[in-house]
């Protein structure tokens, strides 16, 4: 049963327990999860399935999302490459489908947006590598090829004047140093598989143009790989397959949920509930809501491991967080569920993983340490805990931070690692914790916030967590974090997109849980009123550095 909001006290400003109650109620009542639509997914769905509800909204939204410099997407230019390629492809497809609109005012906007995007893509420097986002090594080269195919199909005499010069000598040979991937090369790669790996279902839109029928996944029970774009591509290449109308209905319901737009993963309820619960538990905010927490965790604690979203295989990250919560809440679940992910001195996030994840291994360390604390007389996990702690310490950067493939910000990775090491890393982790705290102190912005591209409440919460887990938490800097978070605790707009999927997204409820729980921990740690460094102005919101 969903939480009955009517039985809860109204949320007093910055009153953590009441705010947590309302957050849990909203999560419990939402079967989708709270995440942001993205330019990439919306553009790819529109290119594959323009018939879906919200066509006009998608086109207008994509046009409105273009930045002044010609790119699309969040973050710095390296992050904007993929959404820009997707947006250009979608707008070129729109012009191709409706040539009669080419010389209309809308056609002019479409053509100008495409021309500006292509011009900027041509001029991008590639000094910074592309981010380690999902399947970027397939998606970017494949989209370069698709853009070029669409450019080659333009009739210069019929094109809008803004596009007329584009096809001639303006093909994209490479973007950000990444060359196009010819379709026959992609087909050769796919020919190596007897069965398409499940991890590639999420990016099937990149494979669909050349995927042989024998490799096309069977009709999924959910969105293919929890991706609307992958599902739209599957439908476009398997329209006669049994169950295709059901998938079309799923896409239509996703479009209805997001106003014609699409997030990169739907639905995120498993991931959302686990991260919200473990974050609130850390601050002691779950005691009142243990029946709800047990219900969620009991439903998720599958014997074969926990997939973060429908259509994915189980992964060590979600499984470890489930084990940690189950152990704390008294829900039966055993650490052997993590054994398939063990790889030497650490754990793979999922089978067939290309790059390791420090946040996943931090969650495993926390889960095994928690299990050992609750079950001291059972199987000994001490050696695994020691190896994991050493593996994490060895991956700390010289300035004191960690980074991770699941999040753009080093504050996220560092907070997750220090949370685990401070509890289960032993004395040998103390120096690493001090280095992390020193890095946080040295990277504070002058407006009292922290952030990789600009100060955010989310990253400020992570910074405070790192300091709280330090051997000697600095009261003055914690007071600064408290003041900044308190000034922004009632912000109700969407948080900045910092989490990695195919591009950047923002899991709203998880971010709000991080801020809530951090304020709760700070309230309990600091004297009242919390100290504020001299000259601190909580009202400042502009760039600090």
Curated annotation (Swiss-Prot):
Any Pfam family hit: SQHop_cyclase_C
Source species of the chain: Streptomyces clavuligerus
PANTHER family: (E,E)-GERANYLLINALOOL SYNTHASE, ENT-COPALYL DIPHOSPHATE SYNTHASE, CHLOROPLASTIC
Motif RXXDGSW motif, residue numbers: 444-450
GO terms assigned for molecular function: isomerase activity; magnesium ion binding; terpene synthase activity
Top EC class of this enzyme: isomerase
Cofactor field: Mg(2+)
Stated name of the protein: Labda-7,13-dienyl diphosphate synthase
Domain note: The Asp-Xaa-Asp-Asp-Thr-Ala (DXDDTA) and Arg-Xaa-Xaa-Asp-Gly-Ser-Trp (RXXDGSW) motifs are expected to bind to Mg(2+).
Annotated EC: 5.5.1.30
Region (Disordered): 526-545
Keywords: Isomerase, Magnesium, Metal-binding, Plasmid
Motif (DXDDTA motif): 315-320
Function according to Swiss-Prot or TrEMBL: Involved in the biosynthesis of the labdane-type bicyclic diterpene labda-7,13(16),14-triene. Catalyzes the conversion of geranylgeranyl diphosphate (GGDP) into labda-7,13(E)-dienyl diphosphate.
Catalytic activity: (2E,6E,10E)-geranylgeranyl diphosphate = (13E)-labda-7,13-dien-15-yl diphosphate
One GO process term, biological-process aspect: diterpenoid biosynthetic process
Family as reported in the entry's similarity comment: Belongs to the terpene synthase family.
Alphabetical list of InterPro entries matching this protein: SQ_cyclase_C, Terpene_synthase-like, Terpenoid_cyclase/PrenylTrfase
């Amino acid at each position: 049963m969903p939480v009955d909001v009517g039985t809860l006290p109204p949320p007093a400003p910055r009153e953590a327990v009441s705010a947590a109650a309302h957050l849990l109620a909203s999560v419990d009542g939402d079967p989708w999860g709270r995440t942001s639509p993205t330019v990439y997914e919306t553009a790819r769905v529109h290119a594959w399935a323009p018939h879906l509800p919200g066509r006009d909204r998608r086109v207008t939204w994509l046009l409105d999302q273009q930045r002044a410099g010609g790119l699309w997407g969040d973050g710095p230019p390296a992050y904007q490459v993929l959404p820009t390629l997707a947006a250009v492809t979608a707008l070129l497809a729109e012009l191709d489908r409706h040539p009669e609109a080419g010389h209309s005012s809308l056609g002019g906007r479409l053509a100008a947006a495409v021309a500006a995007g292509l011009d900027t893509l041509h001029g991008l420097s590639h000094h910074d590598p592309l981010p380690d986002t999902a399947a970027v090594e397939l998606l970017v080269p494949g989209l370069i090829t698709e853009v070029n195919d669409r450019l080659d199909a333009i009739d210069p005499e019929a094109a809008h004047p803004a596009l007329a010069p584009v096809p001639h000598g303006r093909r994209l040979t490479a973007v950000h140093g990444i060359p196009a991937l010819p379709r026959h090369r992609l087909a050769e790669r796919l020919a190596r598989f007897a069965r398409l790996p499940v991890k590639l279902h999420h990016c099937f839109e990149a494979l669909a143009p050349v995927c042989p029928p024998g490799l096309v996944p069977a009709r999924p029970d959910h969105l293919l790989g929890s991706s609307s774009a992958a599902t739209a591509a599957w439908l476009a290449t398997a329209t006669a397959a049994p169950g295709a109308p059901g998938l079309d209905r799923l896409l239509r319901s996703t479009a209805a949920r997001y106003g014609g737009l699409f997030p990169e993963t739907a639905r995120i309820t498993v991931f959302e509930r686990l991260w919200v619960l473990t974050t609130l538990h850390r601050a002691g905010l779950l005691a009142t809501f243990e029946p709800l927490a047990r219900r969620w965790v009991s439903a998720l604690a599958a014997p074969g491991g926990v997939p973060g979203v429908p259509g994915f295989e189980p992964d060590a990250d979600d499984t470890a967080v489930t084990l940690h919560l189950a152990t704390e809440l008294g829900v039966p679940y055993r650490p052997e569920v993590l054994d398939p992910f063990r790889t030497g001195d650490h754990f793979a996030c999922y089978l067939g993983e290309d790059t390791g994840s420090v946040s996943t291994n931090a969650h495993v360390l926390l889960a095994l340490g928690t299990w050992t604390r609750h079950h001291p007389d059972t199987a000994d996990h001490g050696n695994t805990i020691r190896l994991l702690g050493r593996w994490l310490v060895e991956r700390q950067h010289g300035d004191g931070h960690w980074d991770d493939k699941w999040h753009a910000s080093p504050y996220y990775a560092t907070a997750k690692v220090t949370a685990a090491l401070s509890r289960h890393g032993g004395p040998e982790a103390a120096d690493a914790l001090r280095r992390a705290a020193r890095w946080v102190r040295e990277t504070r912005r002058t407006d009292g916030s922290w952030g990789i591209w600009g100060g955010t409440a989310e990253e400020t919460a992570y910074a405070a967590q790192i300091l709280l887990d330090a051997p000697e938490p600095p009261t003055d800097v914690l007071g600064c974090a408290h003041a900044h978070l308190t000034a922004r605790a009632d912000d109700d707009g969407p948080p900045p997109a910092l989490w990695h999927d195919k591009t950047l997204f923002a899991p709203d409820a998880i971010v709000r849980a991080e801020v809530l729980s951090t304020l709760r921990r700070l309230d309990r740690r600091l004297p009242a009123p919390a100290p504020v460094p001299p000259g601190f102005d909580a009202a400042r919101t502009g760039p600090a550095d």
